[in-house]
Amino acid sequence: MMAMDDGFERTYPEIDDWTDSRELLAHARKQADERKLDDVFIVDIDSHISDGGNWPEIMDYVEDPVIREAASAFGDGSKRGAFLNGTNGLQWQNVWGRIPHGQGLKEPVEAGDLSRETVLARRCIDQMGLDYQVMFPNAMLFLGMHPVREMEIHLATAYNRWLVERVLPEDSRIKAMMYLPFNNPEEAEATVKRFLTV
């Protein structure tokens, strides 16, 4: 077993779906220390949030009670993937299992009040010596092509509320890009006005 100064004990012989981000980024932390990157202002502007993994919680932020309740019919009652239009068969970024960390991320996080996303973001921020991390949605990338225009609005609002009300208040170093329902310009404008004042 290898141990570093942060108190985290590294035990993984290989990378898999359960590998801790601190293990994956152990060399990044070492390089950040060697290069004094903590003294340099660094922003990760393309950090992909695990919105798919958090989808059941995001569905709790749907404002329409009928749609919110209907989400429970997906994923054997888990709400997983509810109303999303992404096609799993077209998502091969894990190179058919050869790059396992990411697709179906199962990395354990400590139980507590913080959202899973905040815990994972903090691990990356701290290991890489970042000042800020800007989150960008994953599952939402397909949403602009949703065949039900109104559903794009409902899901965008739920996602944005989850970010603003749940994730962003937990750590000031975490920033995010809001999802604008661009298929409806009036709603896109209303979204900006609504969340700009938060």
List the model feature ranges, each with a label.
Residues 2-198:
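Helix-coil boundary/capping segments in enzymes
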